[in-house]
């Protein structure tokens, strides 16, 4: 899921292709396109990919206050909020690089805390991506790294994927009567266990704390092989994010929904 992919995807981003999106994370607007949607992400590399015409990107950091973001969005006339980035797979058939467009958002308490997504916008996302699963996504507040816990969460919620942002944004969007959608790419499949070092890497600004990861690898070198697998999965997920972001175009397809 998003927190888990922090290590692998950020590693892939920095080593393989980070030069493509070194632009500063900021209010992103191109002169010809008024910002119409807020894209909420959890990681710095996701923010770089999400940036584009018609999009105000917010990276979830220690200082990110969603209520303030939503109030600003309403005041500036934004019309939608989208949760974009990586997720952990819960459905057994999903592999790294597979897409999930949320039909609803649950939280870890189960389906009774269900929040709907915008039907028209979600259909537009499905059409633009071309190959994606339309299913619930569950949001959690703490990492879900073990396959057994992923299976348990899937049974409890019926969700196909899990992240740590969508449930927060869905709640705020509903409170402020903004259209909401979520589109996430799987990085760690349901069968993949995420090693402890992969959970240590994030700094408050959403970037990788490589030193913390390396210290943990030195202390527990048996993690090296699992981390290599995560990095390969993350590369597949990141490649898909770059491809799909181009397909979604200005405002993540919202203007055409």
Task: Give residue spans per PLM region.
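N-terminal hydrophobic/helix-forming segments and targeting peptides
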Residues: 2-21, 26-29
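Glycine-rich phosphate- or other oxyanion-binding loops that anchor nucleotides, phosphorylated ligands
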Residues: 3-8, 32-257
